[in-house]
């Protein structure tokens, strides 16, 4: 049986806690998300792009997310809807 790699688990859990505390408003958890992406980036730098952690996006997706974040505001926002 293979061992599950939980590298960056504290950062992933911090995102979950932040989202729960803030009504799942991702824009209020930017620092936690950035911390996870930083941890995952360092993980892939050490282990290589084929490494895997249940707490990190795949290498290519992480690269895309980091690029998007460097270009500006990309956090999801909670939109209020009117029912009427």
Swiss-Prot record:
It is found in: Mitochondrion intermembrane space. PROSITE patterns: CHCH (PS51808). GO terms for cellular component: mitochondrial intermembrane space. Keywords: Disulfide bond, Mitochondrion, Repeat. Residues 5-47 form the CHCH domain. SUPFAM superfamilies: Cysteine alpha-hairpin motif. Gene3D superfamilies: CytochromE C oxidase copper chaperone. Disulfide bonds join 8-39, 18-29. A motif (Cx9C motif 2) lies at residues 29-39. Its main location: mitochondrion. A motif (Cx9C motif 1) lies at residues 8-18. It comes from the Eukaryota. Belongs to the CMC4 family. The twin Cx9C motifs are involved in the recognition by the mitochondrial disulfide relay system. This is Cx9C motif-containing protein 4, mitochondrial. It comes from Candida albicans (strain WO-1) (Yeast). The gene is CMC4.
């Amino acid at each position: 049986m293979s061992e599950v790699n939980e590298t960056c688990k504290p950062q992933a859990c911090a995102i979950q806690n932040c989202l729960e505390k803030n009504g799942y408003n991702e824009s209020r958890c930017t620092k936690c998300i950035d911390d996870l992406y930083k941890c995952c980036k360092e993980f892939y730098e050490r282990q290589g792009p084929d490494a895997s952690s249940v707490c990190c996006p795949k290498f290519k997706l992480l690269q895309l997310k980091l690029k998007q974040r460097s270009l500006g505001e990309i956090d999801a926002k909670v939109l209020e809807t009117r029912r009427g």
